[in-house]
Amino acid sequence: MDWQKITEKMCDFIQEKVKNSQSQGVVLGLSGGIDSALVATLCKRALKENVFAFLMPTQISNKTNLEDALRLCVDLNLEYKIIEIQSILDAFIKQSENTTLVSLGNFAARIRMSLLYDYSAMKNSLVIGTSNKSELLLGYGTIYGDLAYAFNPIGSLYKSEIYALAKYLNLHENFIKKTPSADLWENQTDEADLGFSYAKIDEGLKALETNDEKLLKILDPSLIAMLKNRMQKNAFKGKMPEILEI
């Protein structure tokens, strides 16, 4: 892939969305992971200024992720704000009768979304998305949480391609080497949740997307079954709410 042209196209896309909406800039959640780090880097290249980063950890958030996110803010000279959301999460736990790790993770994602949109309104800015194509196809995200945003410059890149672009743009090796994680609970990792590495997941997703029957026959049947199940079960996450026509 021609990463120079792709980078230019992404930066043009960001500039166009901000200009056409008559916004001042963009707001994003910076987790310390590679996806949000890449989007922050692209925003800085595209806009130069008015890129606002929110770091919103809980008490179980990986401290290394916070350190990496802070370092990136300094390196890119971003305006940023740290908001500890544990107190909000604790209030939810007190009111809920049956909290699980998944429900807590989803609620944390929706807290972050609410804070981003509140700040974006205050700053007349757009919330920018950080989900990659692998996550979007699988519905691996929280509806009205991290899947809520005005636009997304990296949603056409598979996770494996995210790494390639990050290397091209010289992102710090900490982002490239760390294990992918939504950091929803302690020691949580994407690949443990999904049951396969992103390399295998992307291979399967590409085979399904292109209907490569030859490749589909030799791939792990349990991988293909998992992908199809998640794509079907979570397809609603990528659609607007249906409205009855009368």
From Swiss-Prot:
Keyword NAD on entry: yes
Residues given in the record as ATP binding sites: 29-36, 130, 159, 181
Keyword hit for Heme: no
Root EC class: ligase
Function (record text): Catalyzes the ATP-dependent amidation of deamido-NAD to form NAD. Uses ammonia as a nitrogen source.
Family, similarity comment: Belongs to the NAD synthetase family.
Stated name of the protein: NH(3)-dependent NAD(+) synthetase
Organism from which the protein derives: Campylobacter jejuni subsp. doylei (strain ATCC BAA-1458 / RM4099 / 269.97)
Designated gene of the protein: nadE
